[in-house]
Amino acid sequence: TASATIAREIHGAAEDKGVGFLDAPVSGGQAGAENGQLTVMVGGDAGNFERAERVIDSYAKAITHVGPVGSGQLAKMVNQICIAGIVQGLSEGLHFAKCAGLDPALVIESISKGAAQSWQMDNRWRTMVDGEIDFGFAVDWMRKDLGIALEEARRNGARLELTELVDRFYAEVQAMGGR
């Protein structure tokens, strides 16, 4: 993830040279990249998007042209804000279950069939419960992405109080050696 401002600056430099440019961040992590299952959020001119779509399709399961240059990065910021909040909520929910004397596996079996279901729940709950920190996305990278999103929020006036709090929690994980 990069800032929308950087994407716009690169676009300007590319345009000066007569080169088309798209900002097209991805979601899906290493496993998604290895399996051609990435989700791509594309910002840029519609004509450039149409010319590049077949190439992007070779490594993506989903491609969405979300708007002009910079929009791809902004959509990725939304993705990261959501993931950070979901992971925090899942972690706290599982902690609550353990403290309440519930079997986390049974709780997950139940709630994963309802409105709380998410990719993070399906793929991360076991490592959280077992204390096996298997970061598919490093803490440092999440902090970078949240920092970019929070900076953009300061520019556009969005209030992201929960994201600020979750970012502080990630900072605590970093302070304990999480990378």
Language-model region placement:
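Helical "substrate-binding/catalytic lid" subdomain
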Residues: 51, 70-179
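A broad, low-specificity signal for short, low-complexity segments enriched in glycine/proline
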Residues: 1-3, 111-112
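Rossmann-fold dinucleotide-binding core
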Residues: 2-81
